[in-house]
Design a protein with these regions (language model features):
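Metal-dependent DNA phosphodiester-chemistry modules and their immediately adjacent helices/loops
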Residues: 83-84, 149, 177-179, 215-246
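Intrinsic-disorder/low-complexity coil detector
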Residues: 5, 62, 242, 284-286
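Short intrinsically disordered coil segments
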Residues: 75-80, 111-113, 237-242, 281-284
Length: 298
């Protein structure tokens, strides 16, 4: 993500420590927010004035639109979280974030889950999840259990069922976990798959449909799919899913780069791995079987 930043382009020649002094000839010290000078400038060449030590430099930069900027910031956040988890666990714990629960997120989950399925621990992060409808597909993968394994003379061991995660799992959720992200969290709770860490989810449990079109090509979205527990209780709607371990990310600490929820998930899994280490797959010598049935012995 960082390499895709407009300032990272080699022809811009911006360096860490440079001070932005002006945009299109207008000094940034004369305005309250520098972004005011970037309005309607996406994908247009902008004259960027930099100060490097005592040297003034002018260069050309082409800003991204706000959507691209948001995507790059998101990818940077996910990458930073993954690096933090890997460093804290020495590579024993994996991390994946689900942005939403749509068709594009199937690809994201498959890529990240099957990269990490052989780790001793895994954090599935559904904070800020925007919903969709793939909760059952994901939960199905998490319910798979290894009951046997193959061990060739040369090569790696392979569990049956294949690509089964055998380690300790934790799910991160918060007050911005929405719709199918909440259904996923509720399923994790109901099926006792993993503990949930974070904050109570949004409470939007009645699904909407976009099939109600009107004559002017508009759409009337109607809440029409409530969900219930097997015993008939309303779940999610109006209340959300409460975490097993409540941890809040406070504003100033979050602004300063601290993620208490992620740190709690790492700490929880590290403790679990001490208390319940994951036993490696290891085959025993073949037992003695005796003589074949068609061999007669005296």
């Amino acid at each position: 993500p960082l390499s895709a930043s407009p300032l990272a382009r080699i022809e811009v020649d911006a360096q860490e420590g440079d001070v932005i002094a002006s945009l299109n000839g207008k000094k940034v010290t004369n305005i309250a927010d520098v972004t005011q000078l970037l309005r309607n400038q996406d994908n247009k060449q902008v004259l960027l004035g930099l100060v490097r030590g005592k040297i003034a430099i002018n260069t050309i930069v082409t800003p991204h639109d706000i959507g691209t900027d948001a995507k790059l910031r998101y990818l940077d956040w996910v990458e930073h979280n993954g690096d933090k988890v890997a460093k804290a666990s020495k590579g024993n714990i994996g991390y994946l974030h689900l942005y939403a629960m749509g068709s594009g997120d199937v690809e994201s989950f498959a890529r990240e889950f099957y990269t990490n399925y052989d780790k001793e621990g895994l954090i599935i992060d559904v904070r800020r999840n925007r919903g969709g409808n793939i909760d059952s597909w994901i939960i199905e993968k998490l319910l798979r259990r290894a009951w046997a394994f193959w061990q060739p003379t040369h090569g790696s061991k392979n569990a049956n069922m294949q690509q089964t995660f055998r380690g300790h799992l934790v799910v991160l959720a918060d007050q911005m976990t929405y719709s199918d992200g909440e259904t996923f969290s509720a399923g994790i709770r109901a099926l006792n798959i993993a503990p949930i860490i974070g904050k109570q989810t949004a409470g939007a449990g009645v699904w909407l449909s976009g099939r109600n079109s009107v004559t002017d090509k508009g759409m009337a979205r109607v809440a029409e799919y409530p969900q219930y527990a097997i015993d008939g209780r309303w779940i999610v709607e109006g209340h959300g899913v409460e975490p097993d371990i409540e941890v809040d990310n406070l504003p100033y600490a979050t602004f300063s780069g601290k993620d208490a929820q992620l740190e709690a998930a790492i700490s929880y899994l590290k403790d679990e791995l001490v208390k319940q280490p994951i036993k490696p797959l290891s085959g025993l010598p073949i037992p003695k079987t005796g003589s074949a049935a068609d061999i007669k012995t005296k």
